Amino acid sequence: MAQIQFARGLVEDAIPTIRLTRSRTGDSGTATFYFESPNIFADEQTQEVTGMYLIDSEGEIVSREVKGKFINGKPHAIEAILIMNSPDEWERFMRFMERYAQEHGLEFTKA
């Protein structure tokens, strides 16, 4: 049950592109998520974006660094950044991503 939400209770169906960076020492890292045409922007949705919530069997990882991208005044995409400040946070994120990838038929590729 690995899922991503931008508003509590509204599961995001759009599959993101994710870019990972990690410090040379492994002490910190970032994950940049890009969601094109997320369902939070669907016409029938009235909830506002309150953050990015990565939810799985271990609990929840939260990022408040979420930005909307607009084209011609209409919402088009969401970019969210998750900052990991310790090796434990990195490992926790990777466990979430393994579950999310497995449930959504995704795979990891190095750039």
Curated annotation (Swiss-Prot):
Any single GO CC term annotated in Swiss-Prot or TrEMBL for this entry: plasma membrane-derived thylakoid membrane
Subunit relationships: Part of the photosystem II complex.
The protein's name in its UniProt record: Photosystem II reaction center Psb28 protein
Keywords: Membrane, Photosynthesis, Photosystem II, Thylakoid
Designated gene of the protein: psb28
InterPro entries: Psb28_c1_sf (IPR038676), PSII_Psb28_class-1 (IPR005610)
Membrane protein topology class: Peripheral membrane protein
Family statement: Belongs to the Psb28 family.
GO BP annotations listed: photosynthesis
Primary location class: membrane
UniProt source species: Gloeothece citriformis (strain PCC 7424)
Transmembrane region(s): none
A Pfam family that the UniProt record links to this protein: Psb28
Subcellular location: Cellular thylakoid membrane
Top-level division of the source organism's lineage: Bacteria
